[in-house]
Amino acid sequence: MNPATGKFEGIMAGEMADFLRHQRALGKRFINEERGLLLFDQYLIEQKIEAVTKITPELVDAFLASRPRSRPRSYNHLLSVVRRLFKWLVRQERWLQSPVQSRPRHATAAQTTFLFDRSQAQQLLKLAAELPDNNHGRNRGKIYFTIFALMYGLGLRVAEASRLCRQDVDLERKVLVIRETKFLKSRLVPFGPKIEARLREYLQREGALGPTTPLFSFAPDRSKPITSSTVTQTFHALWPRLGLKVPAGAASPRLHCLRHSFAVGTLLRWYRSGINPQQRLWDLSTFMGHVHPASTAVYLTITAELLDEANQRFHRFAAPLLKEVAQ
């Protein structure tokens, strides 16, 4: 690997580049996966592998061992990248068989996601709104308040919210245009009166902005949008000040928990409105920018409230049948 260019240079450089192009042609960003392939490419160079016959199961195991991962999920992701590369090469008939024989690590008991209820989210927004300006940026309170509100109220990813430009906010039609998201697709996200009011207030405070001007920026000339990492750091700085207790079995709160909270909150509202969530999961999946409802299902942490609503729904469905059986 050439550190300056980030290009593959080892014995499998051509195969890796072709695999990466194929995946991106399917609409995948493959950013983290590319990093994993670059690590493997660098390892092959360091080991002076100059013939593909030298790429054995033992070599793959040695590569994985050279990249210690404390969490099973991280290890399994790296293993998956290498495994997918060779599976693709076998399907393309460029390799006879895959040298990857390593098994995934078993994850420990999965922790649940911390979910913000309405009052907790309001606490976070209040703290964000009170953030003072500093040497690194002005209008910090309004910027972070609005970004967190968009994530909690519309389920946006942090990168989607932070990259918004003025032209992406259509107050007349009440929609946001989310451009080239995680899967290189764009989508429209409608918003209600509360989000509209917050966006109007924010835009009035900011004054006239050009169509491509970033909505959220600390740059004096507004040439660059706020970064996702900056928003994440601010969230983690605010979290201890909330004084909230993390339930037993729940993971430490992350900024992405706001998006999870939106998904679970939507499901709960559907239950309470008598809407069948199974019939609307595609709608939620599209709204959140997923390519398949299976991806959305990951966000739907089962809570006591959801279990209670699902139980009530089952009893309403089953009551007539149980009555017939009892007669």
What are the residue ranges of the model-derived segments?
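Conserved catalytic core of the tyrosine transesterase superfamily
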Residues: 1-327
